[in-house]
Amino acid sequence: AFTIAVPATADTAAEVTIGYLVADPDKVRKFVCVEVSDIPDVAIADPDMMVSMPAGLTAATGMDALTHAIEGYTAKGAWELSDMFHLKAIELISKNLRHSVKEAKAGKPDSGREGMALGQYIAGMGFSNVGLGIDHAMAHTLSTRYDTPHGVACAMLLLIAMEFNKPVAAKRLADVAVAMGVDTEGMDTESAADAAIEAVR
């Protein structure tokens, strides 16, 4: 059947990825399932579909999207094409997430939703080709065991994951800092990687 997918949140990029999760509360775990036929024929990332999200959901889903982009960029399988997607996603999400949360709290129309919609979309295009990392591996267990929203679990673990990966991914984390708008001129690689971690904090 011909399918059209229109997401109502800016996080999972399920409309452009081949994976999905199934939670098993009895086994206290989530199973990652992959099925190419789950990709819809048409995907429409319409920011107007996301304007009703409350501030908490906006923050949680936005941090999931940022985690996708950062983990995808620092993944072992990362390559030139996925790098372009991930760096642009980091830039868009970093520019728009705080504004979107602030506007959601105020109950105002949100000009940042378009950037969030595009950022999560292209992050999904990137990570579906290279995979994710330790943050998501831990977040799946945390969210299942403690009934924590997935985006909140990802946000709680992102700094830990970045610190853990820094010894082997400092250069890539330095690139993340630049994509987040940090002025890294004059910094060495390790300092710039630390600046990325601080920017996420």
Question: What would you call each of these model-derived segments?
Answer:
Residues 8-12, 49, 159-162:
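Acidic, glycine-rich active-site loops and adjacent beta-strand->loop/helix elements
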Residues 145-201:
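Gly/Pro-rich interdomain helix-loop hinge
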Residues 51, 140-141, 185:
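Short beta-alpha connecting loops at secondary-structure transitions
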Residues 84-88, 92, 115-118, 137-140, ...:
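Amphipathic alpha-helical interaction segments
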Residues 1-19:
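Proline/glycine-rich low-complexity loops and linkers
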Residues 16-130:
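Carboxylate- and glycine-rich phosphate/diphosphate-binding segment that chelates Mg2+/Mn2+
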Residues 11, 121-154:
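Glycine-rich phosphate/pyrophosphate-binding beta-alpha loops
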